[in-house]
Amino acid sequence: MQIQAPCPIDMHSREQQPQLSMSFASDFHQCIEGDLAVKSQIGVILPTYCETANIEKLVTEIESLGLPLSILILDDSSPDGTANVARSLQKKHKNILLFTRPKKSGLGTAITDGFKIFLSLEFPPEQIVTMDADYSHNPKEIPRLIEASQEGYELVVGSRYCQDGGTQDWSIMRLAISKIANLVTKLTVNAQISDYTSGMRCYSTDLVRKMIKDLHSHTYEIQIETIRQANLRKSKIEEIPITFVNRKKGRSKLSINEIKDFVSYILSIHRR
C-alpha cells in the first residue's frame, strides 16, 4: 500500500459550494488512501489525534456490526502513529478511507472535511454518522441511529440527557459545565432537543449537502452549528438515548482555547 504524505491542501482556504467543484475534489482525492469507489449506505466519520490505544478496537467493533458502511478516518498527523494503525486496518477491511491532515486543526474542520469527502465520492452514502474515536461513544448505538434516520429524521442526536440517556465516570464539575452549556445553547438555538453538544449523530446526506456551505466552525462548536443550521432549515430532528463513557485510554483533546471558541460562538448567535 502506498503511504501518502499529509495532505498539503488547505480545504478551508476558500468558500466551497454545496456541490464541490470537480477540480477541488480531484485535488484532495489524491490525498486519500483507500478505495474511493467504495459503495456504502452509511459513512462513518472518525476524527483522530493520538488514538493508537483506541482506534483498532473501535474500528473492529464497528466492522462487526455487519452494516453496509464505510469508515473515514481523518488523522491530524498524530505523532503516536495513529495513521499507521489505520493503514494496517485497511489491509483487513477494504471499506476504510484514510485522510491525513498536515496538523492538528480542530474537530470542526475534521467533521466538515469528512462531510466534503463523502459528498465528493462517486457513490456518496445515504447517511453520515459522526462519533468520537476514543471509545466514549459505544459503536453498538450506531444501528439505533440509523433506524431513527430511516424513519424520516434528517438529524438524529445521541443524547446523554433525554430519558434513559446518561454519562459514566464524569466528575460533578464536568457534568455541571456540560448541562449549563446545553441550557445556554437551548435558550439561543431553540431546537427541541436536550443535548446540543453530543458528538454521536446521524445526518442524512441530503441535509449535509444543503448546509455544508454554511458550516465554518473550527472546533467543538461544530456540534451547535450543525443543529442550528438544521433547525433553520426546519429539518426533522430526533434524539435517542445513549450513555457517554469517559475515555479510559489517552488524553482529552478539549483545550481552553476551544472552550473560548465555544463561548464566542454562542455569544455570536445571541447577537444576531
Regions found by a protein language model. Name each.
Residues Q2-I42, K57, T188-N190, D214-R272:
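Hydrophobic helical membrane-anchoring modules
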Residues L46, L69-S78, F99-R101:
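Short beta-strand/loop segment that forms part of the nucleotide-sugar
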Residues L46-T60, S77:
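Active-site beta-to-alpha loop of glycosyltransferases that engages the nucleotide-sugar donor
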Residues A53-K57, D80-L89:
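Acidic helix N-cap motif at the loop->helix transition within catalytic regions
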Residues T60-S70:
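Short, acidic, metal-binding catalytic loop of nucleotide-sugar glycosyltransferases
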Residues D75-N84, K103, Y135:
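A conserved acidic beta->alpha catalytic loop
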Residues F99-S120, Q127, P139-Y220, R247-N257, ...:
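Acceptor/aglycone-binding surface of glycosyltransferases and processive sugar-polymer synthases
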